[in-house]
From Swiss-Prot:
Alphabetized GO MF terms: beta-glucosidase activity
Taxonomy, superkingdom: Bacteria
Annotated EC: 3.2.1.-
Pfam families recorded: Glyco_hydro_1
Source organism phylogeny: Bacteria, Pseudomonadati, Pseudomonadota, Gammaproteobacteria, Enterobacterales
Protein name: Phospho-cellobiase
Keywords: Glycosidase, Hydrolase
InterPro entries per the UniProt record, alphabetical: Glyco_hydro_1 (IPR001360), Glyco_hydro_1_AS (IPR018120), Glyco_hydro_1_N_CS (IPR033132), Glycoside_hydrolase_SF (IPR017853)
Catalytic residues identified in the record: E172, E361
GO BP, sorted A to Z: carbohydrate catabolic process
GO cellular component, one term: cytosol
Record family assignment: Belongs to the glycosyl hydrolase 1 family.
Organism the protein comes from: Klebsiella oxytoca
């Protein structure tokens, strides 16, 4: 029976703005996510406090976390990825002193996890930042935000140093190229130069956070977090092969800086060719040398790349502008399903960086049907996850050093891209619909029992 390494971390992943709710409770400020209630990737619509948005309550994890963590423990989780809402700690982002009520909430959350022997994996910034930093400073386009983020990072490292040993800096940092407001707090019509300058500030902030973590939590580890956007050439034409190399570099560049400590030559050429002159100081270059300890990433799909401009035009409707792969099936939301691609990506990242890897998001968004007896027979989710985990196990056999696996949305949550409840990922069903109706009651899906067995057998129960 093939199993995973003994110290392997099994669990699930969430984000504060998609589960917590309590969006203005206990002194929390508005975030970029709060002002975009019906689609984080859409236009910014500044909300008035009190206006109704589905994320205001989300799944009410802020008040129900003991129940949810108990359910995670029942499944056998030894790891849970959560994020801290920056605006709970610094409501406007630029305060001199943190909000004690916000700090106290995460103390209680981490203590509850410890009671169940669940290791926290904590993201500092998961698709949100204090809205006041966007309004008053222009988001990550302003160099001052680096200092505000470093203060926030140092504050939480010092507060939770005894409780949290695994940290991540920015969720899917490469998504800023596709959704600037979500990633760096810039309008969607920002120029490439503006977006890359904001990304540069974020990369410096990530490195400064790594330095702070190494100083304050010497036995801790801090990683980056990439959207694993593996691309295949649509054909074996040399032009398609080279275009694929370039497209893969567009996301690998973030990992290159965070793992190697400097800008790669291909990006410096890209900046030259596109007339992008970044403000990079000597202090920035020195800061970037502080690299991450491990690489974490999300994996949902692969796509194809072609140098054919007509085919590319048709692909620009989806957020990553990928050409569909004719050899793969797709989910209800059009995401192509490619388990072997996960093994390929693990090998690509391991060969490139030789640093430990961590799969911190993977899962299937689907519409679940509640039967008359209350059961939810999500065999499609079981099949999807089983097939991906089999390939993960093969990658470990290939020699990849993998720390763990946290499925995305182990409990149903509000989706990031559309602010929907109907796009469900969880092993645990939450009774709430897209309009916010429902009791918020939790119930176990068929996949709950399946994942429990996978964890109990350390992957031995997976079907080849």
């Amino acid at each position: 029976m093939k199993t995973f390494p003994q110290a392997f971390l099994w669990g699930g992943a969430t984000a504060a703005n998609q589960v917590e709710g309590a969006y203005l409770e206990d002194g929390k400020g508005l975030t970029t996510s709060d002002v975009q209630p019906r689609g984080v990737f859409g236009d910014v619509v500044e909300r008035v406090p009190g206006d109704s948005g589905i994320k205001d309550i989300a799944i009410d994890f802020y008040h129900r976390y003991p129940e949810d963590i108990s359910l995670f423990a029942e499944m056998g989780f030894n790891c849970l990825r959560v994020s801290i809402a920056w605006a709970r700690i610094f409501p406007h982002g630029d305060e001199a002193q943190p909000n004690e009520a916000g700090l106290a909430f995460y103390d209680k959350l981490f203590d509850e996890m410890a009671k169940h022997n669940i290791t926290p994996l904590v993201t500092l910034s998961h698709y949100e930042m204090p809205w006041a930093l966007v309004k008053n400073y222009g988001g990550w386009g302003n160099r001052k935000v680096i200092g505000f983020f470093e203060r926030y990072a140092r504050t939480v490292f010092e507060r939770y140093q005894a409780k949290v040993k695994l940290w991540l800096t920015f969720n899917e940092i490469n998504m800023s190229l596709h959704a600037p407001m979500t990633g760096v707090g810039l309008p969607a019509d920002s120029s490439k130069a503006e977006v890359y300058q904001a990304i540069h500030h974020q990369l410096v902030a990530s490195a400064l956070a790594a330095k702070a973590c190494h100083d304050i939590v010497p036995e801790g580890k801090i990683g980056n977090m990439l959207l694993g956007g593996l691309m295949y050439p649509l054909s074996c034409k040399p032009d398609d092969i080279f275009e694929t190399l370039q497209q893969n570099r567009s996301w690998q560049f973030f990992g290159d800086v965070q793992c190697r400590g400097a800008y790669p030559g291909y990006m410096l050429r890209y900046f030259r060719d596109n007339g992008i002159n970044l403000d990079i100081t000597d202090a920035d270059r020195a800061a970037l040398k502080e690299t991450v300890d491990f690489i974490s990433f999300s994996y949902y799909m692969t796509g194809c790349v072609t140098a054919d401009e007509e085919l590319n035009k048709k692909a620009r409707g989806n957020i990553l502008s990928m050409v569909p792969n004719p050899h793969l099936a797709s989910s209800e939301w059009g995401w192509q399903i490619d388990p072997l691609g996960l093994r390929t990506l693990l090998n690509v990242l391991w060969d490139r960086y030789q640093k430990p890897l961590f799969i911190v998001e993977n899962g299937l968004g689907a519409k679940d049907k509640v039967e008359a007896d209350g059961s939810i027979n999500d065999d499609y989710r079981i099949s999807y996850l089983n097939d991906h985990l089999v390939q993960v196990r093969e990658a470990i056999e290939d020699g990849v050093e993998l720390m763990g696996y946290t499925s995305w949305g182990p409990i149903d949550l509000v989706s990031a891209s559309k602010a929907e409840m109907s796009k469900r990922y969880g092993f645990i069903y939450v009774d709430r619909d897209d309009d916010g109706n429902g009791t918020l009651a939790r119930s176990r899906k068929k996949s709950f029992w399946w994942y429990k067995e996978v964890i109990a057998t350390n992957g031995g129960s997976l079907k080849e």
